[in-house]
Amino acid sequence: MGYYDLDDILADSSKFACRFNYELPGLGYLEGNPGKPVGKHSKVELPLWLASVLATVTGEQEHVDEEALPFVEFLPPEMFSARVVNAIKADAPTLDVHSINGHFYALGTRWAALFSDAGLAGMLAGMVLERALEVQRHAASAAVEATAPTDATARMLQTLDEWERQLYRRAHAASRDAKLWAARR
């Protein structure tokens, strides 16, 4: 992952629901009201790159004894809801991660880092291990000359997020190269 990585750019542009803690003039266009202020407690979907900055920068204190609040507060995203977490814990290898979000792992690691969520990080690590075994199994079972994946592999590929698809491509290429090398011996 890097600065010019398209998957990073697309993941950072994923929108998350946020609530504003202050009324901010001139930002009404975020709600579809250009030229007007965005109201306090307004709920708006913002791209992750913008929301993460606004969630870490604090505004002015209204009273001396109060703690300054960040400009926005993240609302719990659907992709990390109890329903999704329970589905991951129940059977991670068969979960259709792509239908949840095409950049699930990238967003999950950013979310875990942003909120220091060790539980989410641990769940994602376990999920990666379980699903990587399945990805490797499908990648290694493909024939050397195969131009199209089998039906089972094609169905599995549709459930992968972008990181897992890159993993499949690399594992398939490594398996193909190993089979070609073994055939030459």
Curated annotation (Swiss-Prot):
Please name the source species: Eremothecium gossypii (strain ATCC 10895 / CBS 109.51 / FGSC 9923 / NRRL Y-1056)
- The answer to keyword Nucleus applying to this record is yes
- One Pfam family, please name it: Sld5
Q: Which gene is the coding source of this polypeptide chain? A: PSF3
Kindly indicate whether the keyword Nucleus belongs to this entry.
Answer: yes
Q: What is its main location?
A: nucleus
Top-level taxon = Eukaryota
> What keywords are assigned to this protein?
DNA replication, Nucleus
Q: What is this protein called?
A: DNA replication complex GINS protein PSF3
**A GO term (biological process) for this protein?**
mitotic DNA replication initiation
Question: What is the role of this chain?
Answer: The GINS complex plays an essential role in the initiation of DNA replication.
Q: Which residues form a coiled coil?
A: none
What family does this chain come from, according to its entry? Belongs to the GINS3/PSF3 family.
> What cellular component terms from Gene Ontology apply here?
CMG complex; GINS complex; nuclear replication fork
Assembly, per entry: Component of the GINS complex which is a heterotetramer of SLD5, PSF1, PSF2 and PSF3.
Subcellular locations according to the entry:
Nucleus
Residue ranges crossing the lipid bilayer per the database entry: none
